Amino acid sequence: MNRIEQQFKKSPAYVAYLTAGDGGLERSLESLLALAKGGVNILEVGVPFSDPVADGPVIQEASIRALAQGTTLHDVLTLITSFRQHSEIPIILFTYFNPLLAAGDKIYQQMKSAGVDGCLVVDLPVEEAAPHLTACKTAKIAPILLISPSTTQERLKKINEHGEGMLYYVCRPGTTGVRATLPENFPAKMNQIKSMTSLPIVTGFGIANRKMAAQALQYADGFVIGSLFVKAIAEGISKNALTRLAQSLNPHYPNLRLITPFRKKTF
C-alpha cells in the first residue's frame, strides 16, 4: 500500500497543485512545505511544459516563467527529493507526456527514488498508455488517470481497470482555472462514476473556495485546488500567508477568514 492509498484510509484528500520552478526551486520547496503545514495532505507537483494545453492562463504563465528559469524534469525530481527530507505526505507528479518521453526509460525509477507516489499524465489517453502504465507499475508508482463528464461507461471500465491510488475527475470541460461554482451535473456524474469504481475519486478544475470544496466532499473523496495557489505564489505571497490560505480553504479546518492574497483580480 503506497502513501496515496494510506491517505484515503485516514481522511478525505485535500490536494494542492503548484508548478515546480515558478519563482525558483527554493521558492517551490518553501511553498510545498507551507501547503503541507496548512493541512494539504496530497501534493500535485507540476512539471513545466512549453505547450500546456489542459491548463488555463494562470498555470500556463507559471510554466513559461519556470521554463525561462531553466527548470527541467530532473530539477523537479531534485525538488521532491528535498521535500522528502521534511515530509512523507503523498506526491503526485503532474506532467505532460513529452518530458517523460524525452527523459527515457530510467525516469520512472528515478521518480520513485525521488519520492514520487503517483504520476498523472494529462495528455495521455488510457488507450495509448500501455507502456506508461507498465513502467509505473514496475516502479511501484500509481498511474493516476483522468475521467471527465463525457467519459463513457465502457471507457470508465478501462480506466478503472488500469488506474491506481485514485481517479481524478475533471468536473468541467475546458482548462484549469478558478470558477465560482461546481457544475449543476456534478452530483449525478459523481454518483454514476462511484457506482462503477472502488477507487477513491478526487475532483478538480475550478475549485477555488471553501464552500465549493465542502460541496465537492459531499460526493467525492477529495478535492484539488491549483490555480488559486499558483496565482498566490506568483503574486509573492509569504510562506506563512500561504499556510493560512491553505487552512482557510479547508472545510475540515476551524472556520477562518478567507485570506485574499491578490493585489488585483485577474480571473
From Swiss-Prot:
Q: What is its EC number?
A: 4.2.1.20
The annotated pathway is: Amino-acid biosynthesis; L-tryptophan biosynthesis; L-tryptophan from chorismate: step 5/5
Q: Its catalytic activity?
A: (1S,2R)-1-C-(indol-3-yl)glycerol 3-phosphate + L-serine = D-glyceraldehyde 3-phosphate + L-tryptophan + H2O
- Molecular function per GO: tryptophan synthase activity
Q: Name one GO cellular component term.
A: cytosol
PROSITE patterns, A to Z:
TRP_SYNTHASE_ALPHA (PS00167)
Q: In the UniProt entry, which residues are flagged as the active site? A: E44, D55
- GO terms for biological process? L-tryptophan biosynthetic process
Q: Tell me where on the tree of life, at the top rank, the source sits.
A: Bacteria
Query: Which keywords, in A-to-Z order, does the entry hold?
Result: Amino-acid biosynthesis, Aromatic amino acid biosynthesis, Lyase, Tryptophan biosynthesis
The top EC class is lyase
InterPro entries in alphabetical order: Aldolase_TIM, RibuloseP-bd_barrel, Trp_synthase_alpha_AS, Trp_synthase_suA
Q: Does the keyword Amino-acid biosynthesis apply?
A: yes
**Subunit structure and binding partners:** Tetramer of two alpha and two beta chains.
**General function of this protein:** The alpha subunit is responsible for the aldol cleavage of indoleglycerol phosphate to indole and glyceraldehyde 3-phosphate.
The UniProt entry's sequence similarity note says: Belongs to the TrpA family.
The entry's protein name is Tryptophan synthase alpha chain
* Encoding gene (name): trpA
